Design a protein with these regions (language model features):
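Residues at secondary-structure transition points
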Residues: 28-32, 56-59, 63, 67, ...
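Axial heme c-ligation environment in periplasmic c-type cytochrome domains
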Residues: 54, 75-100, 105-108
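Gly/Gly-Pro-rich "capping" loops immediately C-terminal to redox-active cysteine motifs
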Residues: 43-74
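The canonical Cys-X-X-Cys-His
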Residues: 40-47, 101, 105
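Local sequence-structure signature of Cys/Sec-based thiol-disulfide redox active-site neighborhoods
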Residues: 31-39
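Post-cleavage N-terminal segment of exported redox proteins
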Residues: 1-31, 102-110
């Protein structure tokens, strides 16, 4: 490939990524936290895999909530101690989507 072809490819990739990001943002308006939890988070938070707090375990969630919801959300976004992957491996989730999922798990654990 010459420089011109690489440049066209770069622009195309940027455009596709930009359009995809806008589509994700639009889809988030109708976001279903419970459904996304089932497809993305349940493998760990439904079973305790990798020491994840299990949804419904009041004590485990209370321990985490003592640090505050914002700290819990930042751990979700950035990952934690190599156990919790960044964004919970939900690459199509916005920060607001992740917050909704965290709130769903908290609500189900009280």
């Amino acid at each position: 490939m010459n420089g011109y072809q690489i440049s066209k490819l770069t622009v195309l990739c940027f455009f596709v990524n930009f359009v995809g990001a806008k589509a994700v943002a639009q889809e988030s308006e109708d976001f279903d936290a419970a459904a996304k939890y089932q497809t993305t988070c349940f493998a760990c938070h439904g079973t305790g895999q990798a020491h994840a707090p299990v949804v419904g375990d009041i004590i485990e969630w209370e321990i985490r909530l003592e640090k505050g919801l914002e700290t819990l959300l930042q751990s979700t976004i950035n990952g934690l101690n190599g156990m919790m992957p960044a964004r919970g491996l939900c690459s199509d989730c916005t920060d607001d989507d992740l917050k909704a999922i965290v709130q769903y798990m908290i609500d189900e654990s009280q």
